[in-house]
Amino acid sequence: MDTKTLIAAEIAKVVPELEQAAIFNLLETPKNSDMGDLAFPAFSLAKALRKAPQAIASDLAERIDASQFEKVAAVGPYVNFFLDKASISAQVLTQVIADGADYAQQDEGQGRHIAIDMSSPNIAKPFSIGHLRSTVIGDSLAHIFAKMGYKPVKINHLGDWGKQFGMLIVAYKKWGNEAAVQAHPIDELLKLYVRINAEAETDPSLDEEAREWFRRLEEGDQEATELWQWFRDESLIEFNRLYDQLGVSFDSYNGEAFYNDKMDEVLELLEDKGLLVESKGAKVVNLEKYGIEHPALIKKSDGATLYITRDLAAALYRKRTYDFAKSVYVVGNEQAAHFKQLKAVLKEMGYDWSDDMTHVAFGLVTKGGAKLSTRKGNVILLEPTVAEAISRAANQIEAKNPKLANKEAVAHAVGVGAIKFYDLKTDRMNGYDFDLEAMVSFEGETGPYVQYAHARIQSILRKASFTPAVDTSYSLNDPESWEIIKLIQDFPRIIKRAFDNFEPSIMAKFAIHLAQSFNKYYAHTRILEDDPERDNRLALCYATAIVLKEALRLLGVEAPNEM
């Protein structure tokens, strides 16, 4: 039990007017450490007890069992708790050293599945920085879900169907060169895609041709299908190379095309339940009772189905296949209305498990304040960006540690980690402006800064030849150590908060805070000095490294032992 929960529990024993959870949320950290480690404001009880807050605080301080604390004292309207730092630090360090990387592992999920719809790039288009957010947020959430005891199922719902394939087939047949596409598939396909979109603005007949080719593709035309399959295969080879670089893997690549034969069932179910209404020749589901003004367009007047029809089929398939406890869609905020409709239609169909579905939305990545667009050719491609980040990391490592043995592997871990961490430290609903120089910096709130703190600790432990003894109790009570102990003790709650809010930035900010606290400790403490406290200090370093490495792992970022 962490100290905040312990204090809330002790207060709850003598304050029946408040739930323990409410007490927990009221606890404050005093600005001055001389006033204790945590404080309970008695104002919240003044109305119920009809007493002055100062009198309530004084009464509570006398009635609370103080045996587990150094001291409990009333100061004005607050009950201040002074923690037994030596005892708590011993408990925390013993726990972390014993558990290692399993420290803070939780069993809330009990092995139940969480489906994660993530990454989902469009076939025949380059993997850009715009796709990065869904990929790294989804990957981090998968690690966090597993830490909470769930079994994540990472689904790459590929954009491998739609009118754009009609456009691409027309472009390839008009201007494409097979040898050029085979040599540089994504580059060539992007050029064709940008060109046909530009020319279609002045030549409407190209749109008609594209629609015709997509109709042929839907009907199984051999030439159209072979071209589509080729575009898909070449794109996947490219994507998988990039996923390998990012250290991201998937459990399923079932994309839009996978559900082509599963949508008729959705239409039949909607028809059987009497939910489909005709509107101007199209089929819709009215959702006004859910506060959604616009009906969900299920089938257009020309008989074509829409994204929502496909997503309904996907939701049904995933529930039947994985029996998920939760299903999350890591998709940009611009799709918020779509996912509200999706959940509402499923609810209307009688599927209460739609309440377990969450749209994990996020803001846009911009460059110089401008929105990125593949169609207009305004795009930051991921592959050269990753290469540049690794190169910059290598240059910094060369300057700091030219004798480092495994420079290439470390540069890769730092460069890739820098890009991922910068994205993940941003509250996901906020966008950010892409700045590679800021990302790869070893100073400030960056991935390399946190990684360097971990590598610094490993260097200290190597110099000391220190490995903690599991049967030894280590404890510290100085202010700098205590700041680190409190953070380490808080790690399980940080994981739970990140899980509850689907928010990796909570984990990234924790990692920054822990790295900063350790660097402050390093600057003020002679860790390797040969005195009776040396092993206690080294045990703190050892535990800090475990938690830093695990926090980075939950973000999908490596923690090199040397930098």
Curated annotation (Swiss-Prot):
Motif 'HIGH' region location, chain numbering: 121-131
Catalytic activity of the protein: tRNA(Arg) + L-arginine + ATP = L-arginyl-tRNA(Arg) + AMP + diphosphate
EC number: 6.1.1.19
CDD domains: Anticodon_Ia_Arg (cd07956), ArgRS_core (cd00671)
Swiss-Prot/TrEMBL keywords: Aminoacyl-tRNA synthetase, ATP-binding, Cytoplasm, Ligase, Nucleotide-binding, Protein biosynthesis
Any GO CC annotation of this UniProt entry: cytoplasm
Parts forming coiled coils: none
Any one Gene Ontology BP term: arginyl-tRNA aminoacylation
Assembly, per entry: Monomer.
Name assigned to this protein: Arginine--tRNA ligase
